[in-house]
Amino acid sequence: MVEYKCLNCKKIIKLEELGKRARCPHCSYKILVKLRPKVVKHVKAR
């Protein structure tokens, strides 16, 4: 599940809500930031 955050209104938007437009559906701002996944990845040190 891909989520984006609007830099103007700070609301979290799912990919299904966007459609083909890369704009916030709430405030029509064009700049969205892709959020990092909530899963923590552990890497073994060598």
Curated annotation (Swiss-Prot):
<keyword id="KW-0862">Zinc</keyword>
<dbReference type="GO" id="GO:0006351">
    <property type="term" value="P:DNA-templated transcription"/>
</dbReference>
<comment type="similarity">
    <text>Belongs to the archaeal Rpo12/eukaryotic RPC10 RNA polymerase subunit family.</text>
</comment>
<comment type="function">
    <text>DNA-dependent RNA polymerase (RNAP) catalyzes the transcription of DNA into RNA using the four ribonucleoside triphosphates as substrates.</text>
</comment>
<keyword id="KW-0808">Transferase</keyword>
<keyword id="KW-0240">DNA-directed RNA polymerase</keyword>
<dbReference type="GO" id="GO:0003677">
    <property type="term" value="F:DNA binding"/>
</dbReference>
<feature type="binding site">
    <location>
        <position position="9"/>
    </location>
    <ligand>
        <name>Zn(2+)</name>
    </ligand>
</feature>
<dbReference type="GO" id="GO:0005737">
    <property type="term" value="C:cytoplasm"/>
</dbReference>
<dbReference type="InterPro" id="IPR023464">
    <property type="entry name" value="Rpo12"/>
</dbReference>
<dbReference type="InterPro" id="IPR029040">
    <property type="entry name" value="RPABC4/Spt4"/>
</dbReference>
<keyword id="KW-0963">Cytoplasm</keyword>
<dbReference type="GO" id="GO:0000428">
    <property type="term" value="C:DNA-directed RNA polymerase complex"/>
</dbReference>
<protein>
    <recommendedName>
        <fullName>DNA-directed RNA polymerase subunit Rpo12</fullName>
        <ecNumber>2.7.7.6</ecNumber>
    </recommendedName>
</protein>
<keyword id="KW-0804">Transcription</keyword>
<dbReference type="GO" id="GO:0003899">
    <property type="term" value="F:DNA-directed RNA polymerase activity"/>
</dbReference>
<feature type="binding site">
    <location>
        <position position="27"/>
    </location>
    <ligand>
        <name>Zn(2+)</name>
    </ligand>
</feature>
<keyword id="KW-0548">Nucleotidyltransferase</keyword>
<dbReference type="InterPro" id="IPR006591">
    <property type="entry name" value="RNAP_P/RPABC4"/>
</dbReference>
<comment type="subunit">
    <text>Part of the RNA polymerase complex. Interacts with Rpo3. Forms an Rpo3-Rpo10-Rpo11-Rpo12 complex upon coexpression.</text>
</comment>
<keyword id="KW-0479">Metal-binding</keyword>
<dbReference type="GO" id="GO:0008270">
    <property type="term" value="F:zinc ion binding"/>
</dbReference>
<feature type="binding site">
    <location>
        <position position="24"/>
    </location>
    <ligand>
        <name>Zn(2+)</name>
    </ligand>
</feature>
